[in-house]
Amino acid sequence: MKTLYSLRRFYPVETLFNGTLALAGRDQETTGFAWWAGNARLINLSGKLLGAHVAHAGLIVFWAGAMNLFEVAHFVPEKPMYEQGLILLPHLATLGWGVGPGGEVIDTFPYFVSGVLHLISSAVLGFGGIYHALLGPETLEESFPFFGYVWKDRNKMTTILGIHLILLGIGAFLLVFKALYFGGVYDTWAPGGGDVRKITNLTLSPSVIFGYLLKSPFGGEGWIVSVDDLEDIVGGHVWLGSICILGGIWHILTKPFAWARRALVWSGEAYLSYSLGALSVFGFIACCFVWFNNTAYPSEFYGPTGPEASQAQAFTFLVRDQRLGANIGSAQGPTGLGKYLMRSPTGEVIFGGETMRFWDLRAPWLEPLRGPNGLDLSRLKKDIQPWQERRSAEYMTHAPLGSLNSVGGVATEINAVNYVSPRSWLATSHFVLGFFLFVGHLWHAGRARAAAAGFEKGIDRDFEPVLFMTPLN
């Protein structure tokens, strides 16, 4: 396969101190890459690169299956999922598998099936990865031109982009079909404390769906993370799936316009940087979703959100003190504000005390006690149900705080369990991974732009200042 650039000009060189090191007959001088840039071997070997990608997919799916079975093997039905450090079973439960009213697990067999299916799939992918890495053709262009490509071929690149978009769109519709036709999904807002239900009355109004994108990202608004009913979530997947599929067809059928050809860098490393940037955005959005949203990530499985645990504590002590004779409507706290109830900046009745900062929390166990002007005093006096008390007491002692040594919960809470909430794990890991992916995006974007501009990044090591300085010792 002919490469359209000379390698020396096309690839920016990272100059090492020991640029003469040769591994497996490859050295930096002839390849333009140092020994540690292993993937660079595959840049123009589409068959081998396919093998690397398929094998990587196999590793990912193997982890999913093995970890899934590990969680099933360790699962104790009598304890909530979030007390057991589970991160995969909550996702399956949220999709409506194996759970009943109140999020109670009634059948673990679907979880077992999921794990086995992923393990079997990973074996197929692993075989394909090894085959293409070791036995298959090094390049696909000659034998399988449909699957072959040259990184500079803009039309082919947008065709590949289109195929990926269609696959993502199909993925979005899988959730829609599960919610509509295949048993429904878990709705934490179902009356009486959550249940699995089919989502029939989808929100398809563009003003509602795209209105989320126009919201402020700050408190009370919360951008797309503020979504709090499944009709909007599933309807959003209809819109997203449709846009992805139509956009995919568009990119397959068209060639890039002149402005896009000029504006973008068209090289393998540039595409890598675009992908890392996109994954970084996904990571940051996922972080915010799992930390703040208790509809897409129901508290029955993931534990309460931070604001939810705080409000649950205020509610629990309001219930206790009201039983002991306190007048919750008029009791004053140490600051002169209401001890149990006060008003928000916009006039709603909210919980008093330190939890006032979380006054815009919405949670299924609390909403029935609200009226048109916030918390309703008469409902708080007469209508609190036992399930609401039980759930808030449970959430109060399971705040999503905690450190790596698993001493979780609130430090001052004597009844707390030593655990780290899955919300803490998932939010932290996705933030950290999103950050690293962003750094990788900047790194590869800088290299790709430098290569396209025709210059090499880096200092000429022969004249590096440190070589002319007095040794420290």
Swiss-Prot record:
Cystine residue pairs: none
List of residues that carry Phosphothreonine: 15
InterPro entries: PS_antenna-like (IPR000932), PS_II_antenna-like_sf (IPR036001), PSII_PsbC (IPR005869), PSII_PsbC_sf (IPR044900)
One Gene Ontology biological process: photosynthetic electron transport in photosystem II
Signal peptide start-end: none
Modified-residue entries (N-acetylthreonine), positions: 15
Pfam families named in the record: PSII (PF00421)
Cofactor mode of binding and number, as noted: Binds multiple chlorophylls and provides some of the ligands for the Ca-4Mn-5O cluster of the oxygen-evolving complex. It may also provide a ligand for a Cl- that is required for oxygen evolution. PSII binds additional chlorophylls, carotenoids and specific lipids.
Record field: transmembrane: 69-93, 134-155, 178-200, 255-275, 291-312, 447-471
UniProt keyword list: Acetylation, Chlorophyll, Chloroplast, Chromophore, Manganese, Membrane, Metal-binding, Phosphoprotein, Photosynthesis, Photosystem II, Plastid, Thylakoid, Transmembrane, Transmembrane helix
Residue ranges the record assigns to the propeptide: 1-14
A molecular function GO annotation: electron transporter, transferring electrons within the cyclic electron transport pathway of photosynthesis activity
Superkingdom assignment: Eukaryota
One CC-aspect GO term: chloroplast thylakoid membrane
Residues binding [CaMn4O5] cluster: 367
Location within or outside the cell: Plastid, Chloroplast thylakoid membrane
Subunit structure: PSII is composed of 1 copy each of membrane proteins PsbA, PsbB, PsbC, PsbD, PsbE, PsbF, PsbH, PsbI, PsbJ, PsbK, PsbL, PsbM, PsbT, PsbX, PsbY, PsbZ, Psb30/Ycf12, at least 3 peripheral proteins of the oxygen-evolving complex and a large number of cofactors. It forms dimeric complexes.
Functional note: One of the components of the core complex of photosystem II (PSII). It binds chlorophyll and helps catalyze the primary light-induced photochemical processes of PSII. PSII is a light-driven water:plastoquinone oxidoreductase, using light energy to abstract electrons from H(2)O, generating O(2) and a proton gradient subsequently used for ATP formation.
Family designation: Belongs to the PsbB/PsbC family. PsbC subfamily.
Protein name: Photosystem II CP43 reaction center protein
Species this chain originates from: Cucumis sativus
Source organism phylogeny: Eukaryota, Viridiplantae, Streptophyta, Embryophyta, Tracheophyta
